[in-house]
Amino acid sequence: MIVPRYYENLNVLHENTMPARAYYIPASKRMDNLVEHREESDRMQLLNGTWKFQYFTSIYNIKDSFFEKNYDTENFDEIQVPSVWQMAGYDTHQYTNIRYPFPFDPPYVPQDIPCGAYVHNFEYSRDEKASKAFLNFEGVDSCFYVWINGSYVGYSQVSHMTSEFDVTDVLQDGTNTVAVLVMKWCDGSYLEDQDKFRMSGIFRDVYILKRPEQAISDYHIKSKIEDILAKVELDVKFYSPTNVKISIEDKNGAVVALGSIDEEGTAVLEIASPELWNTENPYLYKLILETENEVIVDHIALRKVEIKDQVIYLNGQKIKFRGVNRHDSDPVTGFTISLEQITTDLTLMKQHNFNAIRSSHYPNAPFFYEMCDKYGFMVIDEADIEAHGPFMIYRKEDTDYNRFKRWNEKIADDPVWEEAIVDRVKLMVERDKNRFCIVMWSMGNESAYGCNFEKALEWTKNYDPDRITQYESARYRNYDETYDYSNLDVYSRMYPALSEIQEYLDKDGSKPFLLVEYCHSMGNGPGDFEDYFQMIQDNDKMCGGFVWEWCDHAIAHGTAENGKTIYAYGGDHGEEIHDGNFCMDGLVYPNRTVHTGLLEYKNVYRPARVISYDKESGELVLHNYMDFDDLKDYVKISYELTQDGLVISKDILSEFSVVPHGEGKTNLKISVPENGKCYLKLIYHLKKELPLLDEDHILGFDESEVSKDDAKCKLAEKWMQKTATDSELQVNEDDTQIHIKGREFAYTIDRRTALFTEMKFAGREYLNHPMELNIWRAPTDNDMYIKAEWKKAHYDKAYTRAYTTEVVQGKHGVKIVSHASVVAETVQKILDVTITWKIDASGKIDADIEATKDGEFPDLPRFGVRMFLDKKLADIRYFGMGPQESYRDKHQAASHGLYRANVGDLHEDYIRPQENGSHYDCEYVELNNSRYGIVASAEKAFSFNASYYTQEELEKKTHNYELIESDSVVFCVDYALNGIGSNSCGPVVLEQYRFDDVLFRFQFTLIPYVKG
């Protein structure tokens, strides 16, 4: 064995590492730009770049001491550091959620453990004023051994934390060689079972810090906020004591406090009339720590986090976390994430009204927290702990009692793991303790509860009593034991139903309630943002939540022939153990293109809302949902009045004061037309430029219907009232068909289905295939559980059959009434249906469909008609909710308007294809080209979908780049669709959004036409 087996030894977590300390970057002189340009410090030597690399499928294949001085690496490959070796073509990709990718046999890992050998030559010049040298690895998965110039330096683990080694005595002036052996797994891998692609290597920065002999080693900044005074306390540790000059400056560079360190290593500085930090105004002071040969520049955010009466306050104000869970993930770089990539994420989050981030499920790179300080995000910092795997071990009795008991016993409540678990929490807290964006420490994720987490919580609360503690998995416990929860500050839940939240508030409510994960954003969804928002706002004990999750996780594998990126998820690399596309559950696509779910979130969490509007008096009442800013200081409000989707007036509202969490009134007197569908839309614009946000950025909108008594869309009404010509109809019947012919049209209805098989108008055939009654949709990710019931009911195989048909012909029209049903093999009749078609001499078709569902069947996915139209009908105009897709429980980001689009534009290209692109609350839709078209219209609003893909194709294909277009425009006119929800990892669709109707009636009109 080339190295000692520390990787399977819980008694050796680290060897020769420096004590954990706060993150900072020193320099020989004052440098104020090191948050985003730390490599410019003359005391930081970045070792990133091209390294020599050799991948071994087994540690036993390493025959040579590659780490020896002057070892010949000519036969080694090259790899970029930082990176993960799977993204460089070594090993295989694997995505797994809960299951360990190796046997559960702690502390042991597979004997033939894969590993990577890294070698890098670099030049080093000793600085006489900074003669000490410390080698830092900010992230290595999973554990590693390190040598310099052939001398063993040390060993460490905890993939997402910094490991620091004193290498002063092994470095030499001139050329040096660092060698690193990285193991794919170690005993620590049992604590790193996070829901993500499993990747390996040196994935964060590597650098040397040059330090004076007499220098600060660590410091802890604490603050106390009083009425008009802030006290800043510093506790400082040294490698060797030295004098320290301390100064604090405001954002304009004015010195507001001076001080020095006393003999105890402490200092207290006072700031009069302090500016407090919050997410809306992230004010930072600059802290300068100056010694004889070194300057450390840091920043301070003055803020106070506390819990009073089970309510969380920031600076004395009740707050709500508008948060999101964020993994380090990129389709090209894996979980090697640059500062630029983080900036992209933070910018998108600000643009979409987030104010908080959970570092799920491990600490991020240290500069991430500096950026959150700067840009105004509250953070839950989470330890690099997830031991979910024991939940999946074999149990003879698979009851909840036994499941939780066994889960707890294996790691959380086994004292042999105490040092490892507490170590990970300490490393996080020590490194990030000076980052004021962090308002809450999380002990980890989904690892059950026991004595080891009691110890971790106890240490954390004793060390840092000013921050909140959180650990959702505390609720998963061994019911035979009594545990201590006294150091846990909030009650956290993942994906609870609204009824479960209410039950806690009614029966317990002893701690603030935190939705640490909610509204699972997988595929088309979520559909319940608004409902959770209302629950959060209705009770002060509800402190908000963190949506799961920020981005889809996928691996990019080039471009398909159709130009689409080939994104791979679980199982696409041949791995046996995987969890499919469960990693595709973000608010943005892997490349950070925005999902419609993110648009939905943005408008649900808009800064203000209309409480009421009286169109007669013009009184407008708004509620300000900002926590700290008066609305007049943050938002400029414009308005638009539309009639049947067209803007008829618009202007800017005069500013008026609405205090945070308060309501305010103004007058907006507008002249509403006597007829038509009229809406008043208030648009909230950012009033001032902010970090990451431009002035006039749209923060959200409100829409209120202000129609008068004649509240019908005139465009829809015009088509529906189209008058018949004087020509008579010809009707011919046989055993299977009914032919209806007018001056400009010829239609055929199949007696066996009671539906159209031909629809010719002006000599053109509109239907490529027969019309269908449609109750199926390509299951969404959020349909993953109800889909089983739907398929058991054979909804996906359903078809229409007719029993009797009666034809009644008049002078200018014909009425065809059929008794029919929707049926499928092996099951009873799903729907009993009466279908009535009225066709007038102009070719207009009025439909009236009455349906009765057998009550034994589950909720329907949808009900409507599906037509396969001439593919040349590619241009769309519609009056309804748009421009993006919208559903009965997912339309907060859509608004009523008269929209134009191309059929291809309506497709939402989810990486795993599924139902998408529907438009809710429509009264009129027109598909056309330059010469002819067809209109669907109704008095009662409907949904429609126009796509180049059939629902069968969407269901069949597992990746978007595999989709093949139909020969038709697939046009669905729907009475209703079942809600979207978030049941992929959340509660079932709320009752009010379920399509559970037993009796329903769908009336609509179809009108083919030619232009001119």
Feature map (PLM): residue ranges:
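Glycine/proline-rich low-complexity spacer/linker segments in large multi-domain proteins
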Residues: 2-26, 31-38, 153-154, 177-210, ...
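Extended substrate-binding grooves/exosites of carbohydrate-active enzymes
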Residues: 1-39, 88, 96, 151, ...
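Extended acidic/polar, glycine-enriched regions
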Residues: 172-175, 237-308, 678-719
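Beta-strand/loop-rich accessory regions of lumenal/periplasmic or secreted enzymes
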Residues: 87-89, 184, 278, 669-675, ...
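Surface beta-strand/loop "capping" patches
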Residues: 213-240, 595-635, 721-735, 849
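Accessory beta-strand-rich segments of carbohydrate-active enzymes
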Residues: 3-18, 37-38, 52-58, 84-92, ...
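An acidic-aromatic loop/edge-strand motif
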Residues: 84-87, 92, 99-108, 157, ...
